Amino acid sequence: HPVKPKDSASLLVLRQGSACLEVLMGRRGRKAVFSNAYVFAGGKVDRVDRLAQPASDLLPDLGQRLSSDPHKARTFAMAAVRETFEETGLMLGAPGDVGETGSESWDEMRALGLAPDLRKLAYVGHAITPASRAVRFNARFFCAWEQDMTGELGGSGELTELAYIPIEDALKLKMVDVTLFMLEEMLRREDNGFATPSS
């Protein structure tokens, strides 16, 4: 029997570099799933991500693309924001109250008087790990702009070599297929002139 995929969410933090679009990536540790691969910040959706309250909600059309259940759609987005905060130190936040969750990461955000600013998220894509794999993810990918993030780049150390990398250069790094597909999708959008913060 194929393993049931776990819900997960990732966030591509983008910035307009001097020559081209850059994306925040880091390297997974040797013992991690996808060991030594370059990835975006992200991870499994936790139960606490359902309890946490955002400062602003997803744009309606984005929510509908994620799931017919608005609560489930929001939970994916909340997980992407939490994982990015844990792994990079950067938070897509606005003044708000996350509420009682019993989660260290959410409590940290709450102490700062911030909650996820979900209206700043755009949707990149969805991927499910093939049935033949031992570890499987049902993954949603979002993107947001660096200028909308607060905090200092650092994080828990789960990702090393954290850096903004020009997307063309990132394509040459060691990564799993789905990471590559999402980078290619961002390049397509850039070629089609999708709205950058400076435009």
Annotate the PLM regions.
Residues 1-199:
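N-terminal leader/linker segments that precede catalytic domains of diphosphate-processing enzymes
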